Amino acid sequence: MFSTPDLKDKYQKKVFQGFKSMKSFGSKDSFFGQIKTVTCHDDNSKVKEILGTNGKGKVLVINSNLITHAAMIGDEIAQKAIDNEWSGIFVAGYVRDVELLKQMDLGILALGSTTTKTNKNNKGFLGEDVIFGGVILSEDSWLYADKNGWLAVSYTHLTLPTNSSV
């Protein structure tokens, strides 16, 4: 297990602390991985597309442009992430099916939950920088999250204690 406060203390000049509080919705309270990004407004087609690819050691960062009326992921899309070995999903937006998500072996952080699903028009962009919580989340940089908060690191995987696990 790792601790974001310990990582922040050890790597002060290498990590950027996110200043936006997130809620945990998956069963994994801590996760980390190399970032892949998707930006989409009221359409999660690209989210589903990228989570259908190999995600071993990766975290998907979803920029929903902070829409509050629709959820970027639910239980079906989260299952796709699990099936493709994603470490976690970080949603700058909302999720749904929270009672099912909490039982799933996946790290999921989001701002909150809502009941409505998005449109399905295959709109969105992959690989764009996401600016959220005072931090630039870039494709192929790293994200570390636990109950304490979340940190981003530019392009360098941190050395974790020997008892750390994804």
Predicted regions and their residues:
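A very general structural signal that marks isolated residues within well-ordered alpha-helical segments
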Residues: 87, 162-163
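A short, compositionally biased micro-patch
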Residues: 94, 145-146
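Conserved small/polar residues in nucleotide/adenosyl-binding loops
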Residues: 156-162
